[in-house]
A protein has these predicted regions:
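Extended beta-strand/beta-hairpin segments
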Residues: 1-56, 66-95
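Alpha-helical metal-binding/catalytic segments enriched in His/Glu/Asp
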Residues: 58-62
Length: 95
């Protein structure tokens, strides 16, 4: 039996409900998560900020792709720690 080929193009839908001025409830694949702002910025701190969510997605993608590349090359990763240091210049985005 041959290797399973993944689809090159996939479609999916994500929905966001504005629960408040700072919190968005996100739904996809039967899962729900929140994107929120910290209390000091008027949020309820129930989830990552939008910027933190973006960096978390990059960290998650780095994990998945690294493991796929390792497996393809016959390497077993016993442990991997991904560290992201971020310096975010908020000038121009602060309303």
């Amino acid at each position: 039996m041959g290797a399973v080929r993944e689809k090159m193009v996939v479609k999916w839908r994500m929905e966001g409900e504005a629960a408040s001025h700072s919190r968005t409830d996100i739904r996809i694949r039967g899962l729900t998560t929140q994107i929120d702002e910290p209390i000091e910025r008027g949020g309820t701190n129930l989830g990552l900020t939008p910027t933190e969510t973006l960096v978390a997605a990059l960290v998650g993608c780095t994990n998945v792709i690294s493991h796929k590349i390792a497996k393809k090359n016959g390497i077993e990763l016993a442990h991997m720690h991904i560290h992201a240091d971020v310096e975010f210049d908020r000038r121009g985005v602060t309303l």
